C-alpha cells in the first residue's frame, strides 16, 4: 500500500519530463503503433542506446484499447514500469527479511529480532524514500527497471545461497531481464557483488558451486542474447557501433555528453541518496564489511555491503558519471540502514537502558540522522531566503509560483514532525523509532512533494504541450515542423510528428534550411520551396531575439511560456542561411557524424 502511494498515486497527472523520458515514451508508442517490437524508433530514427525491455513494457500499456482516454498525457504508461519496479524492490526486500531475519550485532552478542516485520518495512521505506528513488521511480526511463531487475536477481541469488533447498536458477533468469533493461552492465555488477561477497565470506568456490554460476550465465544469455542477435542481423554495424561501442564501452572509457565528474563524484551522491538516513547507512556498511564470516542464512548484511561497494567501485572507475548510476545501490542501502537501526534496538527489547546493545556508534548515527532531519526542516522553513536565488531561464515564473504555493512550508511541517519524532527517541527508549521517523516523510512525499511535482510540470512542461496543441491546429499538409534553441523531445511526442531539432548556434539556421531540402527519415521527406513554401518553427524567446532569426521575419501564430510558434517563409530562411554561409559564420553541419541524435 505504501509503495502504491509513493510511486503510483498521481502518476499520470503530470506530463512527460524533458529531455530523456519523451524519447523512451515516443519509441515505446511507436512500437505499439507500428507493430515493430524489435527496433526502437523515435522521431523517425532508430534509437539504439537502450535494450528493449523498457520499451516493451511501456508499449504494452500504449497498446491498450482507449489508452489515450485514461492516459491523455502518456506519462502513466511511461512511468508505470519504473513505479512497478520500485514497488517490486520494496516487496523483495520485505520478503527477504521476513523469511530470513538477520541477527542484531551488539555488545551483548547476536540475537534474532523479535519483530522482523518492522525491520522489513524499515528497509523497504529506506529504499523508497531515497531522493534518487523518489525521482527515478516515477519517470519513464530504464534506470529504475535496471535497479529493480538487478535487485530481485541478487536477492534471489542470495536466497539460494542462504537456503540450499531454494532453486538456484530464478536469480539468473531475472538477471537476463536486467540485461534486457540496460545492457551487459547488469552482469558486471552482479559478478562484482558475488565475487566480493564470496571472497569476504571465505567461501567463493562454495558460493559459485551452490549458485551453479556457469549454467546460470547460460540461462541469463538465453534470456537476453536473442534480441541482441536479432538486432545485429537486422540493423547490423550501426547498432553494434552505437549500442556496444558508444553507449557501453565509450561511456565507461571516456566522457560522453560532457558528463565529466571527479573520481570522488559518487561519495557525495552516496550521502545525498540516503538522506536523512546516511549516518545509519555508513554504520551499516562498516558492520557489513567487518571481517567475520557468517552462516549463509545470516550473511545478508555482508551481501548488501558488497552489493553497494560493487556499484561504487564500478561506476567510480567509469569515465562518464551520472547520479542515476547510483540507483542500483539503493536497495542495498535500504538493507544496511534497516539492519543498523535494528542493531541499535537490540538491547532495548528486554527493557535495558538507552543505547544498550547499540554502542556509542549507533547513538552517534542516530543523533546525526536526527540532526540531518532537523537541518532539512530548518532549510525548508527559511526557504524565503533561497528560493529567490533559483534562476532558470526555462522557468521564469518558478520562483513566484513556488513562493505563493505554500507547498514548501507544508514540506517543512512534515520534516519538522519527523525531526520531533527523532528527538523524542533520543531521550526515550522507543521501539521502532526509525519507522516513526519515516512515516512523516512518506506524508511529505504524498502531500508536499507530489504537489510540487505538479507545479513544476505546469511551469516547465505545460507550455510545450500548449505549443504542441497549437501545432496540431495550425500545421498545413505540406509543412514540416522544427524546434530551434531550447530543444524539447516532448514536442515530438505530443504532436505525433517528426520534429527537426536544431540548437541556438548559427549552424542551426543553416542546418534547418539544408535539412528541409535534403534530409530523409521515416515520416519526413525532403521538399523544395515550391512543394512546401513555409515551415512551422517552435522557438524560445531568447533564440527568437538573435539577429539571424529576426531576419527571417517569422509570422507569430501563438505563444506559451518562453515558446513562440512561427510560420517561416522558406525563401527568407534560405536567404538568411545563405548569407551566414557566405560570411563564413555558419555551415551545414548536420551530416557530421554524431553518436546521438533524434
Q: Where in this protein do the model-derived segments appear?
A:
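Membrane-integral, polyisoprenol-dependent glycosyltransferases
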Residues: 1-348, 381-384, 560-562
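Membrane-embedded architecture of ER/inner-membrane glycosylation machinery
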Residues: 169, 287-598
Amino acid at each position: 500500500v505504501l509503495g502504491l502511494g509513493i510511486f503510483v498515486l498521481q502518476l499520470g497527472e503530470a506530463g512527460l519530463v524533458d529531455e530523456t523520458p519523451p524519447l523512451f515514451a515516443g519509441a515505446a508508442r511507436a512500437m505499439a503503433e507500428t507493430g515493430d517490437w524489435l527496433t526502437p524508433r523515435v522521431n523517425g530514427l532508430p534509437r539504439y542506446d537502450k535494450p528493449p525491455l523498457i520499451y516493451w513494457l511501456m508499449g504494452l500499456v500504449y497498446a491498450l484499447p482507449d489508452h489515450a482516454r485514461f492516459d491523455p498525457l502518456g506519462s502513466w504508461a511511461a512511468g508505470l514500469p519504473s513505479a512497478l519496479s520500485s514497488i517490486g524492490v520494496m516487496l523483495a526486500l520485505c520478503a527477504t527479511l521476513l523469511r530470513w531475519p538477520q541477527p542484531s550485532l551488539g555488545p551483548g552478542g547476536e540475537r534474532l529480532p523479535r519483530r522482523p516485520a518492522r525491520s522489513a518495512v524499515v528497509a523497504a521505506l529506506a529504499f523508497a524514500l531515497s531522493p534518487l528513488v523518489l525521482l527515478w521511480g516515477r519517470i519513464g526511463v530504464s534506470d529504475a527497471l535496471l535497479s529493480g531487475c538487478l535487485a530481485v536477481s541478487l536477492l534471489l541469488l542470495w536466497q539460494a545461497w542462504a537456503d540450499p533447498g531454494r532453486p538456484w536458477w530464478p536469480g539468473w533468469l531475472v538477471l537476463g531481464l536486467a540485461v534486457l533493461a540496460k545492457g551487459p552492465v547488469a552482469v558486471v555488477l552482479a559478478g562484482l557483488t558475488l565475487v566480493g561477497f564470496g571472497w569476504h565470506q571465505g567461501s567463493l568456490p562454495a558460493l559459485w558451486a551452490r549458485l551453479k554460476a556457469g549454467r546460470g550465465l547460460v540461462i541469463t544469455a538465453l534470456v537476453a542474447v536473442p534480441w541482441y542477435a536479432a538486432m545485429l542481423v537486422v540493423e547490423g554495424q550501426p547498432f553494434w557501433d552505437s549500442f556496444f561501442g558508444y553507449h557501453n564501452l565509450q561511456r565507461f572509457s571516456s566522457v560522453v555528453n560532457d558528463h565529466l565528474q571527479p573520481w570522488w563524484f559518487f561519495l557525495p551522491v552516496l550521502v545525498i541518496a540516503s538522506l536523512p538516513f546516511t549516518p545509519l547507512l555508513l554504520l551499516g556498511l562498516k558492520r557489513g564489511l567487518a571481517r567475520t564470516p557468517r552462516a549463509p542464512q545470516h550473511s545478508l548484511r555482508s551481501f548488501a555491503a558488497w552489493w553497494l561497494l560493487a556499484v561504487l567501485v564500478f561506476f567510480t572507475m567509469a569515465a562518464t558519471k551520472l547520479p542515476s548510476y547510483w540507483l542500483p545501490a539503493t536497495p542495498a542501502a535500504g538493507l544496511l540502514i534497516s539492519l543498523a537501526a535494528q542493531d541499535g534496538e537490540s538491547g532495548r527489547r528486554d527493557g535495558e537502558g538507552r543505547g544498550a546493545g547499540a554502542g556509542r556508534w549507533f547513538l552517534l548515527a542516530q543523533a546525526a540522522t536526527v540532526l540531518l532531519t532537523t537541518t532539512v526542516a530548518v532549510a525548508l522553513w527559511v526557504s524565503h531566503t533561497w528560493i529567490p536565488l533559483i534562476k532558470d531561464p526555462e522557468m521564469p515564473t518558478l520562483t513566484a509560483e513556488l513562493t505563493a504555493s505554500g507547498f514548501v512550508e507544508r514540506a517543512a511541517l512534515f520534516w519538522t514532525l519527523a525531526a520531533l519524532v527523532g528527538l523524542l527517541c533520543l531521550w526515550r527508549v522507543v521501539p521502532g523509532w526509525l519507522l516513526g521517523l519515516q512515516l512523516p516523510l512518506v506524508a511529505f512525499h504524498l502531500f508536499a512533494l507530489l504537489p510540487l511535482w505538479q507545479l513544476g510540470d505546469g511551469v516547465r512542461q505545460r507550455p510545450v504541450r500548449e505549443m504542441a496543441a497549437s501545432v496540431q491546429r495550425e500545421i498545413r499538409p505540406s509543412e514540416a515542423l522544427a524546434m530551434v534553441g531550447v530543444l524539447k523531445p516532448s514536442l515530438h511526442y505530443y504532436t505525433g510528428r517528426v520534429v527537426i531539432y536544431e540548437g541556438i548556434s548559427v549552424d542551426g539556421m543553416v542546418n534547418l534550411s539544408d535539412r528541409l531540402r535534403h534530409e530523409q527519415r521515416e515520416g519526413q521527406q525532403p521538399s523544395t520551396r515550391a512543394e512546401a513554401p513555409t515551415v512551422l518553427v517552435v522557438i524560445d524567446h531568447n533564440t527568437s531575439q538573435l539577429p539571424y532569426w529576426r531576419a527571417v521575419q517569422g509570422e507569430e501564430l501563438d505563444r506559451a511560456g518562453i515558446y513562440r510558434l512561427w510560420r517561416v517563409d522558406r525563401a527568407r530562411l534560405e536567404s538568411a542561411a545563405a548569407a551566414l554561409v557566405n560570411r563564413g559564420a555558419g555551415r551545414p553541419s548536420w551530416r557530421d557524424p554524431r553518436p546521438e541524435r533524434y
